[in-house]
């Protein structure tokens, strides 16, 4: 997601969700902003918003996600995620994220440097391949590259497969399906969290 779905335990692979690698021209020609209502087991828990600025030469994608899970009227889980990703010539350049996951603060920064991507995260510093990308779902072209989690900074052990035009499946550390409209823009997401609950993004 950012939820994360990439946030309740299958954290923020959705997330969460921030942005993907080569920018599909179709995706950029489409909306300059995407907003999703987020549901857990059919109950709306929040919203996920991505705003795009710039063009193919220099693009900035800013993500904000806010979610609250309640037990009756009582909030039992609160989640807030903010991310700014920059791409130059369609290639990943940098990412900065700040997440509050039910009181647990996590910060990640990543940037291209010296033919690799250096990721600073809560667990330390990770060197990722130069073609790696954060998994943020709005650009399906990144599904053919190594992926890292925008909330934790960790490399993901996943396989990706195009089921049919406009439908991609991610399996492994994350269990997520993404759909895209005829113009290539992110349309919806369905996933499963560690506790077995179902998460769904619906574009609004």
Regions found by a protein language model. Give the residues of each.
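Short, surface-exposed coil-to-beta transition loops
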Residues: 45-48, 78-82, 104-107, 173-175
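N-terminal secretory signal peptides and thylakoid transit peptides that target proteins
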Residues: 2-19
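Generic structural detector for well-ordered beta-strands
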Residues: 37, 49-53, 86, 111, ...
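Solvent-exposed helix/loop surface patches that form functional interfaces
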Residues: 31, 88-89, 93-204
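N-terminal, post-signal-peptide region of Sec/Tat-exported proteins
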Residues: 48-84
